[in-house]
């Protein structure tokens, strides 16, 4: 961190299936964050640090409470599966660490809390955020879990990090970055409207809960979603809009842009009828 003024810490394990033990995700998340913050404190030059947490550190265990969750809310730790718990503990340890720094080592802290990140891909690596798209487009999931997700566009999340670095009133704040919440059926219907004519068969039927329990015996990734079946995710993006000045990207655009980029980059097989993103091509030609 020598000679650095600003640091953004974005890395944290995001498993596609439940780990064998909690420590597989909790220890890297907490210790990794602590190591970055310690290095910043020793640098003598770092003025502000942005830590990427998650909206799960806010809504887990608080779904269906009947009110809009904000940055003031914290997940119920006892209700958290390992990944969600890792995000809560890593963020809480970050706030506590900075709070206890001596004056000569103090720096400003901002935390960004995105949801399930979607949008175009700019790298050649597979990641957990691609799983829903890949399974739907390739019909690897014949039925859907009745799951609601807080959707974030990766471009909005990137903008939030930059604004968190530069805005004078950002330090000491958490910022939920989301375009809104969407049920899996709405997600699938968005893909279906765009891609059925291009040869993709997208499932839109919900799987009953007992069916998911049976599937979880053979697919560990299914097990992790069962506790959240049917639960409403109601989180506010007011601070994102009013304080960071970010207009949320429409969820449908995030979903469609990600699908096209996954197909174009080879993460999803092209059908014979695939035409590419015509709206993007039209924008480029206009």
Show where each model-derived region lies:
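Conserved C-terminal active-site "lid" loop/helix of NAD(P)H-dependent oxidoreductases
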Residues: 215-245
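Mid/C-terminal beta-alpha module of Rossmann-like enzyme folds, strongest
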Residues: 160-223, 251-262, 266-286
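Active-site "gating" loop of Rossmann-like NAD(P)-dependent oxidoreductase/epimerase domains
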Residues: 54-81, 122, 137-138
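A conserved pocket-lining segment of Rossmann-fold NAD(P)-dependent short-chain dehydrogenase/reductase
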Residues: 18, 76-80, 123-124, 130-156
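Glycine/proline-rich active-site loop of Rossmann-fold NAD(P)-dependent oxidoreductases
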Residues: 103-105, 119-132, 164-175
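Active-site Tyr-X1-5-Lys
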Residues: 42, 77-109
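Short-chain dehydrogenase/reductase
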Residues: 26-30, 67-92, 126, 147-152, ...
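NAD(P)H-binding glycine-rich loop region in Rossmannoid oxidoreductase-like domains
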Residues: 1-31
């Amino acid at each position: 961190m020598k000679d650095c003024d600003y640091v953004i810490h974005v890395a944290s394990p995001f498993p596609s299936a439940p780990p064998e033990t909690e420590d597989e995700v909790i220890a890297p998340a907490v210790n990794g964050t602590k190591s970055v913050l310690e290095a910043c404190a020793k640098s003598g030059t770092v003025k502000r640090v942005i830590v990427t947490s998650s909206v799960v550190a806010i809504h887990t265990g608080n779904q269906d409470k009947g009110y809009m969750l904000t940055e003031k809310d914290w997940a119920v730790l006892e209700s958290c599966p390992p990944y969600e718990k890792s995000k809560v503990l890593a963020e809480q340890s970050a706030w506590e660490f900075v709070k206890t720094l001596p004056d000569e080592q103090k720096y400003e802290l901002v935390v960004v809390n995105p949801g399930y990140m979607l949008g175009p891909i700019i790298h050649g690596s597979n990641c957990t955020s691609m799983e829903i798209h890949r399974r739907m487009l390739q019909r690897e999931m014949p039925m859907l879990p009745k799951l609601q997700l807080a959707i974030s566009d990766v471009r909005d999340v990137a903008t939030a990090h930059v604004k968190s670095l530069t805005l004078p009133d950002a330090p000491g704040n958490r910022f939920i970055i989301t375009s809104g919440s969407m049920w899996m059926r709405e997600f699938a219907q968005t893909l279906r409207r765009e891609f059925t004519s291009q040869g993709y068969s997208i499932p839109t039927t919900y799987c009953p809960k007992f069916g998911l329990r049976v599937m979880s015996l053979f697919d560990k990734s299914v097990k992790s979603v069962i506790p959240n079946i049917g639960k409403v995710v109601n989180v506010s993006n007011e601070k994102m809009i009013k304080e960071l000045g970010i207009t949320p990207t429409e969820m449908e655009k995030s979903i469609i842009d990600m699908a096209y980029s996954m197909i174009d980059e080879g993460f999803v097989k092209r059908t014979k009828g695939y035409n590419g993103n015509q709206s993007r091509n039209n924008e480029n030609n206009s």
